[in-house]
Structures are given as C-alpha cells and as structure tokens.
Amino acid sequence: MKESSASQGQSASELISKSFAELGDWRGETLSRLRMLIKEADPEVVEEWKWVKPASPGTPVWSHDGLICTGESYKSVVKLTFSKGASLADPARLFNSSLDGNTRRAIDIHEGEEVDGSAFKALIRQAVALNSSGTSKPSKKAKS
C-alpha cells in the first residue's frame, strides 16, 4: 500500500488510524473493517487525507489511478462514497444512498449492520479497474 503525504508531520495512514480510533465506537470499528477490506481488495491502494478546512478535520480517501472512495462518519451512520459508483455493477445492492445522481453512489451503514465483504471488495476492484481504464462514463449495464 502506498501513502500520500499529509499535514502536521503525520502520514495520511496515521491520520486515518487516529481518526477511526478517536471515534471510539461502532463507527470507528466499521470504518477500520472497511479499510482492511479495501487494502485486501487492492494492495496498491493509496491512502490520502483530503479536504482539511477550519470547519472540517479532513476526510479519509482511498485512490488508485484516481479516487476510489471516501469514508465518513456521522452521528448515526458511516458512509462510503464511491466517486464513480454509478458506473459500477452492484449485483449485491450494497449502494443504498446517492442513487439519483449520474456519477456517485454511496453505502450508508448503521449500527449493527454488516457489509458483505466479498461484494464490497468486488466494488473496490471494479472501481480500480475503471480508474485504470480511463473510462468515466457510466455503462448502461451498471444501472439498476
């Protein structure tokens, strides 16, 4: 796995680990599990820490030849947003949020819910293949 540089002398991977640990509840555990699945699906994934603003500490991002997905936590949900999710086949129907747009798709996970690891890794691999191909238009086959 590769890392991009980050701020305050910490690597992006260190910032991601720290932010997940600081959550201290099911959200951090869920994001840590999904992070592990991302790394299993693509050992060459690049972890980044982006969009740091005064009102936001930043967002964990996973990339490979372009953005794959972001991981965010809110009070009652963990959200994984795939930047080109509308172009990915999702036979397991993991995408359950941001379904109306032409580009992004997201997976919202609530406390107690589990994500099918095999199906999730398949989405990661598809996203990497799509980024590597240079294609950005949604395929008609991927829509459901």
Locations of regions flagged by a protein language model:
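Charge-dense, helix-prone N-terminal extensions
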Residues: M1-S144
